[in-house]
Amino acid sequence: MTDSFEQISAHNEELARDIVERASARGVTVSTAESLTAGMIASTIADIPGASAVLRGGAVTYCDEIKHRVLGVEQETLDRYTAVSHQTAREMAVGSLELYQSDIAVSATGYAGPGGGTEDDPAGTFYIGWAHRSADGGVPVVDSVRCHYEGDRSCVRAHAVTEALGRIAFVLNSME
């Protein structure tokens, strides 16, 4: 049995509350770059009291042109790998990190469904990218994960928020 949108959202609120509390206590800032979630990650964080000490901003970059112009995703990356790929998710996260000068950035790009997708990445597939400043302040640490969830559009998007918040929590844990 799959969780309902309401159940997923309640879980996301708990994750966001933990992130805001821990990031605020450490003076760590967060930013987002969102495509399929269209601002849901930033909104979930912003719903928590005290988020203004943590959330630097979020970019909704639904189309490829804006991913390129706002976040600096290379056109070659979009052409070669598509907007729904590890490479694009990583470049989106780095773009958010630089744009907002945050300590941690997370990105989400994918196919929420019910249509769209490819044979390799069907509807319900998304990529979460994350980037954070290295301990020595040098080149950012960047990674991504591919996820797939069956369900309606709203649940796929809510699961993407869960995965993104989980990556922020993961990075916060690594900073302890």
Which residues make up each language-model segment?
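Short alpha-helical segments enriched in small residues
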Residues: 1-176
